[in-house]
């Protein structure tokens, strides 16, 4: 009985070392911002811009391996946007959907592939930007602004007529839907990335390093899927806002 209590206390101590919600704040005027989220976001943006710049230098008619990779990514984003928004309207939205997908994809993977834990901060620790609810909410709200803008740009004020279609009785439900879209986008992404990092952190604290490796690979796969889901839904919402209802 004593041994069981000792093991339980040991496990509780190790798991308790995995802290959630610790933040380093920067004061900008009267506001406080999460410093580690800004730092890791800048790292992710720098990686995307740097790799894109290097891969697009010295473009050739017969593409190199790096050029092939960039062209494949661009074609993938183009096809994704085209399938959700439509043949006639998709081109202006390729940069937006592509930026969303690449930022979320690299952010998700950075939590597993970049040794953020080696960087010591006065408070908190560095982690994937999408591990913070503020980042995912900002991305979701940006998506909401995008599909409202798309609908108003194409249809004008008649865009709001969708709220009373097919019957005015559905007005409250249709309005509520516009609030649930960003909520579902933000909490789905945040929950999956946070849960993945917590599971790996707990396993590393309990068992040797080799055991959590399969979970890390599974986390990389689910992180890529979450980036794809977010980009697909963002494109689908934009396509829904500009489609003609009869």
UniProtKB/Swiss-Prot annotation:
Subcellular compartments: Plastid, Chloroplast thylakoid membrane
Write down the membrane topology.
Multi-pass membrane protein
| Keywords, ordered alphabetically | ATP synthesis, CF(0), Chloroplast, Hydrogen ion transport, Ion transport, Membrane, Plastid, Thylakoid, Transmembrane, Transmembrane helix, Transport
Has keyword Chloroplast? yes
**Keyword Transmembrane helix included in the entry's annotation:** yes
Which is an annotated GO molecular function term of this record?
proton-transporting ATP synthase activity, rotational mechanism
Residue spans crossing the bilayer: 35-55, 94-114, 132-152, 198-218, 219-239
| UniProt GO cellular component terms | chloroplast thylakoid membrane; plasma membrane; proton-transporting ATP synthase complex
Its biological function?
Answer: Key component of the proton channel; it plays a direct role in the translocation of protons across the membrane.
Xref: NCBIfam families: ATP_synt_6_or_A
Family of this protein: Belongs to the ATPase A chain family.
Assembly, per entry = F-type ATPases have 2 components, CF(1) - the catalytic core - and CF(0) - the membrane proton channel. CF(1) has five subunits: alpha(3), beta(3), gamma(1), delta(1), epsilon(1). CF(0) has four main subunits: a, b, b' and c.
What is this protein called in UniProt?
Answer: ATP synthase subunit a, chloroplastic
User: Which species does this protein come from?
Assistant: Chara vulgaris (Common stonewort)
